[in-house]
Structures are given as structure tokens and as C-alpha cells.
Amino acid sequence: MALGFLTDRLDRADRSEAKEVEAPQAPLPRESLESLHLFGPRCTWLVAMLLVQSVSSLILDSFKGLMQRHMSLTFFLTMLVGLGGNAGGQSVVLTVRRLALGKPVQVKEQLHVGLLLVLVMAPLAFVRAYMQQTPLSESLTVGAAAAVITVCATIVGTALPKLLWFFNVDPAHGAVGVQVLMDIAGIAIVCGLGYLFLELPAKFAK
Amino acid sequence: MALGFLTDRLDRADRSEAKEVEAPQAPLPRESLESLHLFGPRCTWLVAMLLVQSVSSLILDSFKGLMQRHMSLTFFLTMLVGLGGNAGGQSVVLTVRRLALGKPVQVKEQLHVGLLLVLVMAPLAFVRAYMQQTPLSESLTVGAAAAVITVCATIVGTALPKLLWFFNVDPAHGAVGVQVLMDIAGIAIVCGLGYLFLELPAKFAK
């Protein structure tokens, strides 16, 4: 979350590296780019991120019934949302590095990696939930959510910086983007799968 | 979350900058440091982070009653936990930069900034929760949690890299540390304040 200051740092590192090749004796005037130590910019970032991330509360609110009936799902929300941010962040960094080196970036390739990661992460998330006396159906939902979140995160984490790069925007900004997107998408995926696996069968049974 | 790969990148950027001064014609053999594109290291990182972040589910599980009686608190968990990661991450980056430039880093100074940030973030979190038809007492808990989380995040985000630096460990690793710590601390703070504000008064009233 809020990797803006880090990506800014990366930008500058990248730019200073580029500068290095042209004229190593003349580094960028870095001090002029620094603003995080000022109260205004720092506070503005925090306010913006808080408001965007609060969208997650709207989604959860609209699935209030599901969450009340299956409390265990809420216990694993932070873990699952974190997984999306982590896996997506990894893909962004890999993509930014490959683009910087002029290497080709293929979403299909990262989708393949995402599917391989699912083979480890989904069973792990399921076992972790089941170990905590979580009912089988809810543990399976946690595992399935881990699978969908991992695949989505690797795709978004690759496609987003590639898209930014295509539109001449620094792909490093994808680091913030993927964290915010996967925070909200993660919540939506858990709620959606919860409805599909835990609520729908009960409705059909009636 | 999982900023390890980013801080690694920063480390290398820093090291290459240092190298620049000594011998600009001989950059570090960067390729040898790269491992994130390999399945093993990437998956190991994700597994480790998932297991650490799953501690949050144990805390929530032990406050199950509170969460069931005050569902609105769970809706704002992702937003509040995100705030801790964001504010803490900002402090880490500021501290790492100051240490790199040989400037003094004072936890007291960041505590002061944290208290100023609280003046904006706590009312904002309260209003955001209250706007969503959250009961007044729960909205106040969300606001109070935002306050405590913001102050904790700025302190931990400053003290952790300073501590790492003191023990000759790269302070940049504080970026991962603060995210994981504030994920878990954030959940604990919301649960603790929820118990204090929403459960204790009811017990005394009996």
C-alpha cells in the first residue's frame, strides 16, 4: 500500500542511472524532488489512500448477511488481501525491471506463473484456515479466494505497468496501483466466492 | 506489504550510487542478485508473508464476539490496516533517506508529525464511517483506532529502521517489517479499542 514514495524513489534511482550513462558528473537535483518530509504532501497521500481503500467497506457492507453468517471469512480477509498485494507487487517489480532492460513482457507468461503459484498458495490458505477450526466449506472458500486472488494479482501486476508504459506513463506507478486495486478486488473476490459457495447452495436447497 | 523486492531494488540502487562515486565504469554485477523471477524465491516470500499475516486471523478469532456484535468494525478493518501500512511506510522511507544522508533521525520528531496527522486522519476516518450509517459509538471507535494506528505507525516506522541501522542491518528492510507489524498491530488496536469502547461500558452498565 502507498508505494508512491517508494516508486518515486525508484524513478529517481532509474533516472540517476540513466543520467549516469550520459554524464556521471552531473546528478539530478534530487532535493528539489523531495516532498514527503513536508506535512501537506504526506497528509494528502494518506487521505487519498484512505478514501480509496474505504471502498472495501462499501463492498463488505453490501455482503453484511454473508459475513454475519460466516464470520470466519472476515478473520482471513487481511491475510487474503495481503496475498493479492504481495503477489501483484512482485509482478509489478518484475515487469518494471524487464521493461527497463528492454526485455519483452508477456501477460500470458505471468498468468502461467500465477497458476503455478496457485498450486502452493491455495492449498496453504485452505490448510491454514482449516487448522483454525474453520468449517470445511468456509476453509474451501478461503482456499479458492487465495487461488483467484493470486492469478488476478499476477495478471494485473503485469498488465498495469505494461499499460502505463504503453501510454508513456512511468510503469513504476503500477506499484501503488496494484496495491489499491488488489485491496478492493481481494475483498470483492472473497465476498463473491463466499456468496457462490456458501449462500447459493443453501438457496437452491430450499 | 512484501516490499522486500522493492527494498532489495533500493539497496542495489543505493549500492550502485555508492559505486558510482568510486568507479563509475564498473557497475555491480546486478544480474547475480536477481532472484524474484525464479519460482522458488518468489513462492517462498509469498508463503512466509501469508503465514505471518495469518496471525491477524488468530487475533480476530479471539474477539469473535465483539466482531459479531459490531459488524461495522470489520467493514473498516482493511481501510484502517491500510492506513497503518501507509503512514508507517512513509516514515520508513523518510528515515532511510535521512540515515543515508547522515542526517539525525529522532523518533520524538516523527511522533510530533504523527500527532499532527492524527488531527486530520482521525476525524476523516470517523466521518467516513459515520457517513455509511455506522452507529456513533462504532464510528468513534474507527476514528480512535485511526488515531492510535497513525501514531504507532509513525513511531514504529522511524524506530524500526533506526534500530536495524544501529545493529548494522540495512534500514531499508524496515519497509517490509513495518507493513507486517502494522498489519497485525492494526487488527489488535481495532479489537482492543472496540473492547474498551463498545464492550466494557456495557459490562459496567449491568
Please tell me what each predicted stretch does.
Chain A
Residues M1, C43, G88, D170, ...:
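Residue-level signature of catalytic and energy-coupling elements of molecular machines
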Residues P123-S137, L193-K206:
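Juxtamembrane and boundary regions of transmembrane helices in multi-pass small-molecule transporters
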Residues S16-E22, L33, F63, Q68-S72, ...:
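Juxtamembrane helix-loop transition segments at the membrane interface in multi-pass membrane proteins
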Residues S62-L77, T134-A144, F204-K206:
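Membrane-water interface of transmembrane alpha-helices in multipass transporters/channels
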Residues M1-M71:
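Cytosolic regulatory modules rich in charged/polar residues
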Residues W45-Q53, S57, F76, L80, ...:
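Alpha-helical transmembrane segments in multi-pass membrane proteins
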Residues T154-K206:
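Hydrophobic alpha-helical transmembrane segments of membrane transport and translocation systems
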Residues E31-V47, P104-L119, L140-G143:
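Soluble-to-membrane junctions at the N-terminal ends of transmembrane alpha-helices
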